[in-house]
From Swiss-Prot:
It comes from the Bacteria. Nucleotidyltransferase involved in the post-translational modification of proteins. It can catalyze the addition of adenosine monophosphate (AMP) or uridine monophosphate (UMP) to a protein, resulting in modifications known as AMPylation and UMPylation. The active site is at 256 (proton acceptor). Keywords: ATP-binding, Magnesium, Manganese, Metal-binding, Nucleotide-binding, Nucleotidyltransferase, Transferase. It comes from Dechloromonas aromatica (strain RCB). The lineage of its organism: Bacteria, Pseudomonadati, Pseudomonadota, Betaproteobacteria, Rhodocyclales. Its EC number is 2.7.7.-, 2.7.7.108. HAMAP family: YdiU_SelO. Mg(2+) binds at residues 257, 266. Its cofactor is Mg(2+); Mn(2+). This is Protein nucleotidyltransferase YdiU. ATP binds at residues 95, 97-98, 117, 129-130, 180, 187, 266.
Amino acid sequence: MNAPESLPVEFPVFDNSFAALPEAFYTRLEPHPLPEPYVVGVSTEVADLLGLPAELMNSPQFAEIFAGNRLLPGSEPLAAVYSGHQFGVWAGQLGDGRAHLLGGLRNDQGHWEIQLKGAGRTPYSRGADGRAVLRSSIREFLCSEAMAGLGVPTTRALCVIGADQPVRREEIETAALVARVAPGFVRFGSFEHWASRDRSRELQQLADYVIDTFRPACRDAENPYDALLRDISRRTGELIAHWMAVGFMHGVMNTDNMSILGLTLDYGPFGFMEAFDAGHICNHSDHQGRYTYRNQPHVAQWNLYCLADAFLPLLKHPDISRVAVDETYGDAFAQTFERLMCAKLGLRHALPDDENFIGETFGFLQQHRPDFTLFFRRLSRLSGGLDGEAMAKADAPLRDLFVDRAACDAWLANWRARLAQTPWDDGERQASMLAANPKYVLRNWLAEAAIRKAKLKDYSDVQRLLTCLRRPYDEQPEFDDLAALPPDWASGLEVSCSS
């Protein structure tokens, strides 16, 4: 690996706050070089967030740097250890099996850690090759940035770097890696690891690190660790509410894939809801349907129970740890979900019966299965006060999503009756709804089409999707084709944990 002085431009100096923890928490090691790397896609928004110099972005060495082939100034690469529950079963020790934390950058926009996912074997690889493939790396890159555009808390992605190195999965694919960016990558499973080993000292060291680095306000609480658990519970509730509101399904909500910062983490077999089915399984490795759309709020709460159990040695009143989760998570999820759904439905002010109306709406969607994203986007354009032929003409695009149009008309009548209870200028309401209901989401078929071209070294669709998904609530008529229903060829697409 080349030394930092070989870099073409001055690079912001890294620090690695996680490396200040004892070495039991990680293994220091350098990324394994990726031969002859090349750039597949770059998020200039994330580059700006990091304050990367333009000369570096345009440099031929950029791919070498973010393939892990060049050491960055101040970088102390490491792979972290953690454990976790996978599909509801204790899996024991896991860890960064192919991710290398390069370090962090601090600027006026915050503290940002950069992690290379797919940078080679670590002591936690459990026999795997430590690589990621082009397919999964493009999916994670695009979805990270798409979720940011949607306003959902998420890790970010700076770039995808590819190589022609073959790797074996279900078939031979080519290696790639994604440079992930977040304030931190500590997981629920990071705490479970030490709790499962009765290592209270390390458990407290980790909690202190999280408080001091990310949540200093917790230090002023009567019990800082109880405050931290409640903070994580609240942020997780808000996160899951955002997922549900945009129709996002994570696909593999294991405790090692849950961020203590309330961020969407580890994009694998994810999906966005199309024809609405609350029982949809987006991960074909999820044979029991544990991670369906409807189950996500319950699974997140179960994961928080696992975290609360890990926190027990730190709490003054351990007997109420799960009660704290129930109260904090439950309230945060319910309040955030109601607020987001009221915005999607154009309800100016929440009324006591809105929870029932929202529930009835989801029952209606379940029965008739329109496309989730198109339903709410087209609803956003409807008037609350037209009559007769004018209303029928305005309603036609939404009604076209239904076989049973009489049922659609009946629901629309109920919706308009609810709108009348909190009057709002039609134009203002429509603008508000359009800002709450995206036109564009990263449908699996869109990602698949871009991946197929990328395998032929054509990355134009990766860039086109990235550009579009930065502003998913804007009309962007030049991207109308990306808002279409899935084509026939996409009906058999499946995604799994293989990456």
